Regions:
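Glycine-rich adenosine-cofactor-binding loop
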Residues: 53-71
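A short, well-structured juxtamembrane/interface segment
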Residues: 38-56
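Flexible, glycine-/basic-rich loop-and-beta segments that form/coincide
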Residues: 1-38
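Short, solvent-exposed loop/turn segments at secondary-structure junctions
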Residues: 6, 66-70, 92, 124-127, ...
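Short, flexible loop segments at boundaries between secondary-structure elements
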Residues: 84-98, 144-154
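Substrate-recognition/cap helix-loop segment adjacent to the acidic, metal-dependent catalytic center
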Residues: 71-84
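Phosphate-bearing ligand-interacting subdomains
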Residues: 102-154
Length: 154
């Protein structure tokens, strides 16, 4: 960051990023309104699915506790009444709680002890590797829920 007309030359990467942002229409308010509408549609779909699962007396656990999971938990109104605990393989996150919602974060060993019916993947960008690493959960009848970029039950 520098002052306008500063002494530093603008790197070509800055021009590239500005060009990409303009191509993606990031300088238009409508882009963000459309994004918000898409997220709210996913929110409604996920809330309806979670309500249906809970109405069937099925259990739901979260999987993955990245920082972005906090945003998802808040925006999608997910709390301990819906999701009892969050599983994370990172020992540094275990035995802690999710910010604000205070959902316990536990080891993945609990999957095979408590056997939740569904795992809501909160680290959706790692969904493939999470499902691959926990194939046994699926073999035992469990299902994975991937909330974004589009809702998938696998």
């Amino acid at each position: 960051v520098q002052l306008q007309r500063g002494v530093h030359k603008i790197n070509n990467s800055v021009h590239k990023i500005v060009k990409e942002e303009l191509e993606l229409r990031m300088d238009h308010e409508e882009t963000y309104q459309e994004f918000g509408e898409k997220i709210n549609l996913q929110k409604t779909k996920l809330q309806n699915l979670l309500k249906k699962i809970k109405d069937e007396n099925k259990t739901i656990a979260g999987f993955g506790a990245p920082a972005k999971s906090t945003t998802l938990l808040y925006h999608f109104n997910i709390n301990p009444a819906i999701m009892e605990y969050i599983i994370d393989d990172n020992k540094l996150k275990q035995n802690l709680f999710s910010p604000g919602k205070h959902i316990p974060i536990v080891s993945s060993e609990i999957i095979y002890e408590k056997r939740p019916d569904y795992l809501l993947i909160l680290a959706w960008n790692f969904a493939e590797s999470i499902m691959k690493n926990h194939q046994e959960f699926k073999k035992q009848g469990g299902k994975f829920i991937i909330p974004l970029p589009r809702l998938v039950v696998n």
